[in-house]
Amino acid sequence: MLDAIQCIEPNFSGKGLKIGIAMARFNTPVCHGLRDACLAELEKLGVAAGDITLATVPGALEVPLVLQTMAKSGRFDALVALGAVIRGETYHFELVSNESGAGVTRVGLDFDIPVANAILTTENDEQAEVRMLEKGGDAARVAVEMANLHKTLRG
């Protein structure tokens, strides 16, 4: 039966793809690690530097608005959200984590565009530092794979 099913294989070729990145500046060292890993992976996947737009914002709560603006422009095949929310001693962590995550997801669904979410939510700086390189690269791969899948499915 599987032989009769049309299977769409993952496509990690970034050639010709336009990628928009919204990056929070709060927790700067972690965000820079995410950014550097994401850009390095996009380059490995064949995305040209001139096809990448990077916009920075104050914090994670501002990321969805910039993603929405990028999505509305119609200039991008996929978007990437980068940021770091590290738990403190107040309820603010939950608020920022939940709202930024929901906003990022909503942009993708509302504007029919793939969005890779690499806004880290961690208990401490050490966890963020361990995850930043892996998750930055993951976000790049997700953006490229989903952009290609999206194009294939849309015909």
Curated annotation (Swiss-Prot):
Catalytic activity, EC: 2.5.1.78
Pathway involvement of the protein, from the record: Cofactor biosynthesis; riboflavin biosynthesis; riboflavin from 2-hydroxy-3-oxobutyl phosphate and 5-amino-6-(D-ribitylamino)uracil: step 1/2
Coiled coil: none
Residues the record lists as binding (2S)-2-hydroxy-3-oxobutyl phosphate: E89, T90, R131
Annotated CDD domains: Lumazine_synthase-I
Enzyme kind, highest EC tier: transferase
GO BP, sorted A to Z: riboflavin biosynthetic process
Residues annotated as the enzyme's active site: H92 (proton donor)
Swiss-Prot/TrEMBL keywords: Riboflavin biosynthesis, Transferase
Gene Ontology molecular function: any one: 6,7-dimethyl-8-ribityllumazine synthase activity
Catalytic activity: (2S)-2-hydroxy-3-oxobutyl phosphate + 5-amino-6-(D-ribitylamino)uracil = 6,7-dimethyl-8-(1-D-ribityl)lumazine + phosphate + 2 H2O + H(+)
GO cellular component assignments: cytosol; riboflavin synthase complex
One Pfam family named in its UniProt record: DMRL_synthase
Residues holding 5-amino-6-(D-ribitylamino)uracil: F26, A60, L61, E62, A84, V85, I86, N117
InterPro entries the UniProt entry points to: LS (IPR034964), LS/RS (IPR002180), LS/RS_sf (IPR036467)
Family: Belongs to the DMRL synthase family.
Cited function: Catalyzes the formation of 6,7-dimethyl-8-ribityllumazine by condensation of 5-amino-6-(D-ribitylamino)uracil with 3,4-dihydroxy-2-butanone 4-phosphate. This is the penultimate step in the biosynthesis of riboflavin.
PANTHER family the UniProt entry points to: 6,7-DIMETHYL-8-RIBITYLLUMAZINE SYNTHASE, 6,7-DIMETHYL-8-RIBITYLLUMAZINE SYNTHASE DMRL SYNTHASE LUMAZINE SYNTHASE
The protein, known as: 6,7-dimethyl-8-ribityllumazine synthase
Organism this protein belongs to: Chromobacterium violaceum (strain ATCC 12472 / DSM 30191 / JCM 1249 / CCUG 213 / NBRC 12614 / NCIMB 9131 / NCTC 9757 / MK)
Designated gene of the protein: ribH
